[in-house]
Amino acid sequence: MVQTSSQSTVNKIEMRLRGKGRGSIVFQQDYADCGTPSAVKSTFHRMYTDGMLVRLAHGIYYYPKADKEYGLGIIYPSVEDIAQAIAKRDKAKIVPMGAYALNRLGLSTQMPMNVVFLTNGAPRRIKIGNGRGILFKHSSSGKNFAYKSELMMLVVTAMRTIGEEKITDEERNVLVEHAKNVNDNDFNHDIKLAPAWVRKILIVR
């Protein structure tokens, strides 16, 4: 039996999805070689309506993984997972900013509706539903992306977000404790990238 063009497109996309495995974030444009633009678009739309894929944002889908241990249904990716997948696809680096950096370190219980990342890639805003979004702000400063330790990067970002004049003793203590978990080689490299007032606080870790 001869396959139609649309059937061939479906088979190619399904095979690639199975190869990536459940729990993967996928981009429709990465499957452009599987068929004509209309065939690829209709295949993704059909997979979404059939429940095979979850649509996270325009052109961005999730090949869902279920929680088999507790039966809690689909394990959805975090905003961080989505942002990192976009950065990886674009071959860009990203740095969490503002309220999200504070949330990551336990300094705030509020999860911002719009999570902000600095990027050395293209600036853009991704709408991910329910009023939430991911905002990528372009930065040409190499310092922002030169950290060896992600934790150290978060600590410095959080301190800069709070500000030298507004940081409390409690916040200072929490951040110093986080910095203690950075290995010495990374710390000695990364501390040089921080503002002078941040260095004075963290150097006593």
Each PLM stretch: what is its role?
Residues 2-85:
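Short beta-edge/loop segments at beta->alpha junctions of small alpha/beta modules
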Residues 28, 114, 170-171:
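Short coil/turn segments at secondary-structure boundaries
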Residues 40, 97-98, 151:
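Amphipathic alpha-helical interface surfaces
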Residues 56-59, 92-128, 133:
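Short gly/ser-rich loop at a beta-strand->alpha-helix junction or flexible surface loop bordering the NTP-binding
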Residues 82-84, 133-140:
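Short amphipathic alpha-helical segments and their helix-coil junctions
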Residues 84-86, 97-100, 157, 161-165:
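Positively charged, aromatic-accented nucleic-acid-binding surfaces
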Residues 89:
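Basic nucleic-acid-binding interfaces
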Residues 138-205:
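Hydrophobic alpha-helical interaction segments
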